[in-house]
Amino acid sequence: MAARLSLRDYQLGLSARLQRAETDRGAASKLGLEAGGGAWLVDLTEAGEMIPVPPISAVPLARPWFCGVANIRGNLYSVVDFSAFLGGEATAVTDQARLLLISDRFRAGCALLVDRSLGLRKSGELEPRAAGAESKWTRAEYTDTEGKRWRELNVPALVRDPEFLDVSV
């Protein structure tokens, strides 16, 4: 019972820290990740959590970018290789590879397989770019203080897109 209480305390503390990070001016407000050689940002309200890649059960007759399903704490999540979905190379499952669980508020039950997590990014360090959106899932584009290009993922548009929802061959 003590382990459950400790886990709950940890989750409450983490939730409070994330809320403070969102409300603080110039604080980290977007999760950075790397997929297909590109840097992506995800709004914290649209991300569930980032976890190491668990065992994934393949699904027959599925598109190449659909990895299969994973059991995460008793819940089944469909796993999409984000790089392959975008038309790039398949993501190698390494020690750095991660699954980004999409927020439960979308009721999508899905996770994106990405190359690695790049941590939280401060809004004050990102300069909006004038360039048009590269895909219908790109909300905005930014450049950081080091000149690196970032694309912000539009999660609601992604999880409602018919192409994303159709995993059968």
Task: Show where each model-derived region lies.
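An acidic, low-aromatic, low-complexity terminal/linker signal
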Residues: 1-169
